[in-house]
Amino acid sequence: MRMSEYFRILQGLPDGSFTREQAEAVAAQYRNVFIEDDQGTHFRLVVRNNSGLVWRTWNFEDGAGYWMNHVIRNFGILK
């Protein structure tokens, strides 16, 4: 296996608010990260596991990306 195949470069979210494009790029990397409560410009990014909801945040909240990155690192399931 080549080193480039072993390591995947994953896109994370900025520490503050994030855009739909950023959320879609992150959600596309994981089996358990979803966009929900879509209201057009505002939506929630959600992490779930077998037991249900782990964490969710609105895309415009202060520190939304920081905390979501933390949760995804701990609970995200890569595709």
Curated annotation (Swiss-Prot):
The gene is yubL. It comes from Escherichia coli (strain UTI89 / UPEC). The keyword Nucleotidyltransferase does not apply. Disulfide bonds: none annotated. This is UPF0401 protein YubL. The keyword Manganese does not apply. Belongs to the UPF0401 family. It comes from the Bacteria. Keywords: Plasmid. InterPro entries: DUF905, YkfF-like_sf.
